[in-house]
Amino acid sequence: MLDRKASRLRLAGQFKEMRMQALLVLAIVFCALPVRAAVPPAVEVERVRVGLERILNENIVPFWYPQVIDEKNGGYQLNHDSNGTFQGPSDKALVTQARTVWFFSRLYNSGYGGPEHLAAAEHGYAFLRDQLWDDEFGGFVWSVDATGQIATRPHKHLYAQGFALYALTEFATASKKAEAAGLAAELFYLLEEKAHDATYGGYMEWFRRDWGPGPKTGTYMSTPIDGKLMNTHLHLLEPFTTYAELSGDDLVRERLIELILVQSNAVLRKELGACTDKYARDWTPLLDPAYARVSYGHDIENVWLLIEACRAAGLPNGPLTDLYRQLVDYALRYGFDHERGGFYDAGNFAQPADAKSKVWWVQAEGLVALLYMYELTGELKYWQAFVATYDWIEGQQVDWRHGDWHASVAPSGVASGAKANAWKSPYHNGRAVLKCLQILTQMNRGASTVE
């Protein structure tokens, strides 16, 4: 009896010890988990919201409207130096003409714009339709001269076609014009016919004006011959997301899901935790030394565009949240200025940034990605990085004297770069401010923009 009693006591002791060990393990695990739903001070949230409204209403919108409207030739005049002074007529590129149509349309749709901004969008839409659209072969040429009468770069690149679809979709939403929605549908199905890669997924990018294979040199972008770019497919996510919402078309949703797979898998170097840009047609990464670099801006932009794409496709974001965290955390580790706020431009694999200028569009995309990550995860570190990025933008990237944002700010603090040109428009920073205001407003109401 004594032996059995002793045995039971030993077993009870062992069970108690095992239970304590299990509880200890659970405690360690839970302590290691991120703190969720950490709430920033209300006064800080309001400070940022008010500041973003000021940037939009006093810095961004007044710079672009009405001075870029070309009343004589149509479209927008986008050739302004670092002080915002117009430098004279220049070619009109599809990328920035379309981005500016998108911005004025989105400004109107957001409620921050008025009828004058819808009219500005319609002015640009007419130029896309009448001057940049190729009546003979379909699709849009890359650029025309200042008058819109001569195609200075007549070939077709999917990067620019994507922005045309983005503009048409947003303008159709703003104007309720069936013509704009019809042109968007025509463009989508043209890209389906001419550019979709049914063998390897994604889209071929570079074509002659007649949609034959593009010339072997002068690709307008850095697309490898017969290859693909993460950058191009990143910027197909945007229009396919909004066009899926506008059209309700099953094929658009199918192609959107395909792009989600590309942008969450094919372009990711999983062992690194970051994306690279250049690929062969079959998505084999091209990792020559010049290509083995990380663009922090593209990686963090990819995160929030994927979040919105999943929502539009009716897919939950939960399965991809670890990927989002991986990409943003990589950028925060290697490409973030933890002293002054803001993101650097680029760097080698798993190394601190070596291109340390702060480029306007990188700050804009970082702002949105960080706020989305805070909303999605509740992790306060993303809110803190968001505020630090906002403070950098408000204090250093915004040009309060001449309007809009400095294109680039060097580590020394010297600003440089044009305010408007073939690559700079109100799209990145205007969109970022509008998007963050939308998210902050919904957060204040207790609603979520992420599912």
Description of each model-found segment:
Residues 22-32:
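Bacterial N-terminal signal peptides
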Residues 17, 24, 236-238:
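Intrinsic structural disorder/low-complexity segments
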Residues 7-13:
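Short, low-complexity intrinsically disordered segments enriched in A/P/G/S/L with frequent Arg
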Residues 19, 33-34, 67:
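Prokaryotic Sec-type signal peptides and long signal-anchor helices
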Residues 37-451:
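Glycan-recognition and catalytic cores of secretory/periplasmic carbohydrate-active enzymes
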Residues 6, 29, 35-36:
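Residue-level detector of alpha-helical hydrophobic segments embedded in or interacting with membranes
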Residues 13-19:
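Short, Lys/Arg-enriched N-terminal segments with co-localized hydrophobic residues
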